[in-house]
Amino acid sequence: MPMQGAHRKLLGSLNSTPTATSNLGLAANHTGAPCLEVSIPDGLFLSLGLVSLVENVLVVAAIAKNRNLHSSMYCFICCLALSDLLVSGSNMLETAVILLLEAGALATRTSVVQQLHNTIDVLTCSSMLCSLCFLGAIAVDRYISIFYALRYHSIMTLPRAQRAIAAIWVASVLSSTLFITYYDHAAVLLCLVVFFLAMLVLMAVLYVHMLARACQHAHGIIRLHKRQSPAHQGFGLRGAATLTILLGIFFLCWGPFFLHLTLVVFCPQHLTCSCIFKNFKVFLTLIICNTIIDPLIYAFRSQELRRTLKEVLCSW
């Protein structure tokens, strides 16, 4: 069931694109003009989802095992891993169900299939919203730890973090239920796009401000020790490179998906837009790739978490 316009499920029929025989090809739109269509084999999609699933399960298990990691920061990281786990798991589940239905291996009533479809859609949408929210929450947590270092533990207490986490999950589930129910309204898609842009701006502003403070601190140390300025410039370049990678990965992995939703609203029948719609599964694959990259950026850089992860793996 490929995407043909605005009157499709937000996360259900949209990602139920058929598998082509080649990985890259030219497909014709309804006017006969060639469209560049990149096909993601179901095997590759499921494999990436499995890697993400295993990786994020390990993060959750490591944080749950080590009491030293039961701080507000690691609670947000754990919830990010859990939401990423649900993103990959729900997409894998829907792909598997579609393949079984197409193969005739799963025979059930249409009403049951539709109910399952809606449930998976809500799970996928809510986990995506949670993933974006927890990326923003981690940025806020790090910002407070830098700019309010002396008051950090009194501001970011564990009960406050737990209340914030509960609020994020409840709001995401309720919002996704409304989004899936009213998926054919343009306002729903625009709300999702605005939410993504808000998270992008929030992360960019906070991380840029943190980088500026870090460069200022490094400059003060250099002046104190009377070192040469190239060291400060090198630190600034490394910090800028790290920031570019962090925000760049976020934008490249999530941006195409929300661009797709924007085009569904503003040009559902345009020839160029219809060509872009054919690559929806590519955009979902990029999100799955982001769920694989997130633990590398936010979790595995912690020496304590890596040590606990080794203990978890050895215990198995």
Curated annotation (Swiss-Prot):
Record keywords: Cell membrane, G-protein coupled receptor, Glycoprotein, Lipoprotein, Membrane, Palmitate, Receptor, Transducer, Transmembrane, Transmembrane helix
Where would you find this protein in the cell? Cell membrane
Residues annotated as glycosylated:
N29
Residue ranges annotated as Extracellular topological domain: 1-37, 94-118, 184-191, 267-279
Positions where lipid (S-palmitoyl cysteine) attaches: C314
Q: Which stretches face the Cytoplasmic side?
A: 64-72, 141-163, 212-240, 301-316
Identify the stretch annotated as signal peptide in this record. none
Q: Which GO terms describe its molecular function?
A: melanocyte-stimulating hormone receptor activity
Which residues are listed as membrane-spanning?
Answer: 38-63, 73-93, 119-140, 164-183, 192-211, 241-266, 280-300
For this record, the Gene Ontology CC terms, alphabetical, are:
plasma membrane
Protein's membrane topology: Multi-pass membrane protein
For this protein, the record's Gene3D superfamilies field holds:
Rhodopsin 7-helix transmembrane proteins
GO biological process entries? adenylate cyclase-activating G protein-coupled receptor signaling pathway
Q: Known Pfam families for this protein?
A: 7tm_1
- Note the SMART domains from the entry: 7TM_GPCR_Srsx
**Known InterPro entries for this protein?**
GPCR_Rhodpsn (IPR000276), GPCR_Rhodpsn_7TM (IPR017452), Melcrt_ACTH_rcpt (IPR001671), MSH_rcpt (IPR000761)
Quaternary structure and partners:
Interacts with MGRN1, but does not undergo MGRN1-mediated ubiquitination; this interaction competes with GNAS-binding and thus inhibits agonist-induced cAMP production. Interacts with OPN3; the interaction results in a decrease in MC1R-mediated cAMP signaling and ultimately a decrease in melanin production in melanocytes.
Family statement drawn from the similarity comment of this UniProt entry: Belongs to the G-protein coupled receptor 1 family.
What is its biological role? Receptor for MSH (alpha, beta and gamma) and ACTH. The activity of this receptor is mediated by G proteins which activate adenylate cyclase. Mediates melanogenesis, the production of eumelanin (black/brown) and phaeomelanin (red/yellow), via regulation of cAMP signaling in melanocytes.
Q: What is this protein called?
A: Melanocyte-stimulating hormone receptor
Q: What gene is behind this protein?
A: MC1R
